[in-house]
Amino acid sequence: MKKWILTILIFYASITNAATLVGQVVGIADGDTITVLDAGHTQYKIRLAGIDAPEKKQAFGQVSKKSLSDLVYEKVVSVEYSKQDRYGRTVGKVLVNGVDANLEQVKRGMAWFYKKYQNELLLQDRLDYLHAQENAEKDRIGLWVGNDSVAPWDFRKTAR
């Protein structure tokens, strides 16, 4: 019985083991990747969790980058994170003045909800991102203006 309870506690600790990074955004790589400089002058590449923005050479790629820049560039942000991706980037939710920048990119039609990694998100974030994309599609906002939007994961496959 004690082993079972300990196993459950370890499991829940691992899925809620999020840390927070605070710093100023000093770079925008694209519509879902930024660079944050913390108070100790350490730079971190941050990949916005739960979304996938168009690639730079893809339609809406530069527009998506500009949108993210308008949201966060030179602003102090909090990044709630719990992992790094295979490229060494910290993956997390970026908050600027209490606003979820990841969600805002999806609302603006500047990124897709990245369902492939949805299990890494809190349930409420999953629902928010899903509804934001549905609304952007319905209202034909941003990359949803035309019928020819290509998801970044499909674009990357054809670019290889």
Short names for language-model regions:
Residues 2-5, 14-160:
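Small beta-barrel nucleic-acid-binding modules, primarily SNase/OB-fold domains
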Residues 10-12:
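Small beta-barrel nucleic-acid-binding modules, principally OB-folds
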